[in-house]
From Swiss-Prot:
Kelch repeats lie at residues 122-168, 170-195, 196-241, 243-276. SMART domains: FBOX. Pfam families: F-box, Kelch_FKB95. This is Putative F-box/kelch-repeat protein At1g19930. InterPro entries: F-box-like_dom_sf, F-box/kelch-repeat_ARATH, F-box_dom, Kelch-typ_b-propeller. Residues 8-54 form the F-box domain. The keyword rRNA processing does not apply. Keywords: Kelch repeat, Repeat. It comes from Arabidopsis thaliana (Mouse-ear cress).
Length: 344
């Protein structure tokens, strides 16, 4: 029996409110592909009403935003988001099916030496360095419209601050005092067990917002987090340090353990730029590979890792896929500075 196909003209003649309701139920990973269907689809996919509908019907998703920064003086940021890749009939290369799609975001504020934190569908850009001076500014990226808004300034200027979200509030530490390196005093914040853990130097402290108490963590938690990458997934801290394995922190015995099961991943170069992020309970891992004559360019790679706790002393990672996700090489001057998971 022959199936009846819906005429293309019928789809394109749908009123905007109905089209918004339909597209709101499609995974946001597919939006870049849908934007290629027609100018009208591309226009509807930018409407705030679309994202309001997604929120109302409970269909928001974790979306990974990636920011590449140039070492040039102007520090122009380039923004991307992870999405599904259009598969062409002529494609012969085995692919994960994912790619970093460019996001045109005009009038981006400086992001050099600042801290980014996601709050709902927004990304807060806090502090940093503007014209080689510490900044107290706060700017907000609306990930529905991809426009920047000016937020309330901090009372203190901060360079290399660390920001975390806890109970609906953003806590910012560090970055106030200039050291002899010309950088702010540096800490790294993570939220575990409902407490803000702040590590800097050789010791750390934990802040409990319920009773306002600060408790010492000692030195066992600190591994120089500021110079690598860390994230918290389902109340467990994960951490990467140059040329080492990915580790997780066992709060019961207060020690770091190696994340098992990642033998299919390559060994990262000593000075590779590695970033970790919580991607809906899985680990998103980004790193770069040097290419070209004299390692003049970089390729940006990504792996999505499912995590499984097998007993109290072991966590295993299963690499679901890994692939080069930027379709082209980038000059050595560009680094993957930030990876942020946003609910949109």
């Amino acid at each position: 029996m022959k199936k009846n196909k819906v005429p293309t003209e019928l789809i394109f003649s749908l009123p905007n409110d109905l089209l918004v309701n339909i597209l709101a139920r499609v995974s946001r990973l597919d939006y870049p592909i849908l934007s290629l269907v027609s100018k009208r689809f591309s226009s509807v996919l930018t409407l705030p009403e679309l994202y309001q509908t997604r929120s109302l019907v409970g269909l928001t998703e974790n979306c990974l935003y990636v920011c590449l920064l140039s070492s040039r003086a102007d520090r122009i940021p380039s923004w991307f988001k992870l999405c599904r890749r259009p598969i062409l009939a002529s494609d012969t290369r085995k692919s994960s099916g994912y790619v970093l799609a460019t996001i045109p975001i005009p009038h981006s504020p400086p992001l050099h030496r600042s801290s980014l934190v996601a709050v709902g569908s927004n990304i807060y850009n806090i502090g940093g360095s503007i014209s080689q001076s510490q900044s107290s500014s706060v700017s907000i990226l609306d990930c529905w419209s991809h426009t920047w808004l000016e937020g309330p300034s901090m009372q203190v200027e901060r360079e290399y601050p660390s920001a975390s979200l806890l109970d609906g509030k953003i806590y910012v530490t560090g970055g106030c005092r200039l050291t002899f390196h010309g950088c702010g005093d540096q800490t790294d914040n993570v939220v575990v067990d409902g407490k803000l853990h702040s590590c800097g130097g050789y010791k750390g402290v934990a802040y409990n917002p319920n009773d306002g108490r600060w408790d010492s963590l000692g030195s066992e938690m600190n591994l120089g987090l500021k110079w690598s990458s860390s994230c918290v997934i389902e109340n467990v801290i994960y951490y990467y340090y140059h040329n080492e394995n990915i580790k997780w922190y066992d709060t019961k015995v207060r020690s770091w353990r190696t994340l098992n099961g990642l033998k299919t991943l390559p060994r990262f170069a000593r000075y590779a730029n590695v970033r970790l992020a919580d991607y809906g309970g899985k680990m998103a891992l980004f790193w770069d590979k040097f290419t070209g004559c004299g390692n003049q360019n970089r390729m940006i790679w990504c792996a999505i890792i499912a995590l499984e706790r097998r007993n109290n002393e072991e966590i295993w990672g299963n690499v679901e896929w890994s692939d080069a996700v930027l379709p082209h090489q980038v000059p050595m001057a560009y680094v993957c500075e930030y990876v942020v998971a946003v609910n949109v």
